[in-house]
């Protein structure tokens, strides 16, 4: 198994698919990385040489924010909004939808499981 950006990449998959196992790399980034390094996207990971794996690893480290750095940056951005006290920050703080979705019904994913209310029998 090749290890890139702290993630074990599956060896039996194509390179462009296997790179998507890294948090922060999607379809377009994986194709871009393959182009930049000069690796054919349809090749399998187990067919790559050690030099090619090192090139891919260096390309990802040099140009992309992935895995822990990306997660940390995202959480710091949310924390900054909460500290500012802006509308989006308040919505994050109250664990409600941030982007204008309705909350009267729905929003169960964001709000969590429904809390039973006493005296609501019919």
UniProtKB/Swiss-Prot annotation:
Determine the domain of life of the protein's source: Bacteria
Please give an example of a GO cellular component term from this record: cytosol
Q: Does Ribosomal protein appear among the keywords? A: yes
One term of GO molecular function: rRNA binding
Q: Does the keyword Amino-acid biosynthesis apply?
A: no
The record's annotation in SUPFAM superfamilies points to: S13-like H2TH domain
Task: Report keywords, A-Z.
Answer: Ribonucleoprotein, Ribosomal protein, RNA-binding, rRNA-binding, tRNA-binding
Q: Where is this region: Disordered?
A: 94-122
Q: Which Pfam families match?
A: Ribosomal_S13 (PF00416)
What does the protein in this record do? Located at the top of the head of the 30S subunit, it contacts several helices of the 16S rRNA. In the 70S ribosome it contacts the 23S rRNA (bridge B1a) and protein L5 of the 50S subunit (bridge B1b), connecting the 2 subunits; these bridges are implicated in subunit movement. Contacts the tRNAs in the A and P-sites.
Family listed: Belongs to the universal ribosomal protein uS13 family.
HAMAP family in alphabetical order: Ribosomal_uS13 (MF_01315)
The identity of this protein, by name, is Small ribosomal subunit protein uS13
What's the source species' lineage? Bacteria, Pseudomonadati, Pseudomonadota, Alphaproteobacteria, Hyphomonadales
């Amino acid at each position: 198994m090749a290890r890139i950006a702290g993630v074990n990449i599956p060896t039996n998959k194509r390179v462009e698919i296997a790179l998507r196992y890294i948090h922060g790399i999607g379809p377009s980034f994986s194709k871009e990385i393959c182009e930049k390094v000069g690796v054919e996207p349809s090749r399998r990971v187990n067919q790559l040489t050690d030099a090619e794996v090192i090139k891919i690893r260096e390309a990802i480290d040099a140009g992309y924010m992935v895995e822990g750095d990306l997660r940390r940056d995202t959480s710091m951005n949310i924390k900054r909004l909460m500290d500012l006290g802006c509308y989006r920050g308040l919505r994050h703080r109250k664990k409600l939808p941030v982007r204008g979705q309705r909350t009267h019904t729905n929003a169960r994913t964001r709000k969590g499981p429904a809390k039973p209310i006493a005296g609501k029998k019919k």
